[in-house]
Amino acid sequence: MVLKIRAKLLFFFHISKKKRTFANKLIRNTMSSTPAHYVYQEPAIEFVTVAVQLCLYLEQVAEHEKSDFIEKMLCLLPLLYLKARLLPKGTEEMDGYPERFVTEQEYEDVRQLIAQQLGSDDAYLEVFMEDMRYSDEPITAFISENIADIYQEVKDLACNYQTREETIMNDALVSCLEAFEQHWGQKLLNVLRPLHALSLTLIDE
């Protein structure tokens, strides 16, 4: 178990000397007989690891085929949802909100990359939206926009984790989980339906 966690941590911190020192600190906490801090516990590490994998893939999505993108999302997004569901709730340790790292331009870059990858398949009809309370008809939604919203939340978390400050990491994790419950968890589930349909269409072709 410890070796598995160590491998995940070294992947996350890219194995540089400075980051390896921090990763080793996390490992020592996981091996300690006393309860580890919230941010060092295995559920948190596993959630952040999947979040980082998703971010890295989305930032390089132009290098992949449409079919690969769809299959990757159908693997990573359910895994991210599962890891978020298994994450115990933490408690904020600071006043104020964690720092936001993703700029409007970075968000738009990711959204556009996904939209270009999907083309006309980006749009789909959605019934699980806040705006549906004002409409009797399904509303057009976009896979690219929903995934970009998810990206923004988990990328901010990953960047806050890389500060290596426990209180910052803690509050970023708490904030990300709250946002998961409030909006991006539902958005994640929403896009799985059209992505699943697209994957079957590609098989038929």
Q: Which residue stretches match the model-derived regions?
A:
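Charged, amphipathic alpha-helical oligomerization/scaffolding segments
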Residues: 46-53, 72-79, 83, 109, ...
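N-terminal interaction modules that seed assembly of large macromolecular complexes
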Residues: 32, 37-39, 45-104
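Acidic, proline/glycine-rich low-complexity IDRs
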Residues: 33, 138-141, 149, 153-205
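Compositionally biased non-globular segments, especially hydrophobic aliphatic-rich helices
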Residues: 10, 24-26
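Long amphipathic alpha-helical segments
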Residues: 89-158
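Polybasic, lysine-rich low-complexity intrinsically disordered segments
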Residues: 4-8, 12, 18-19
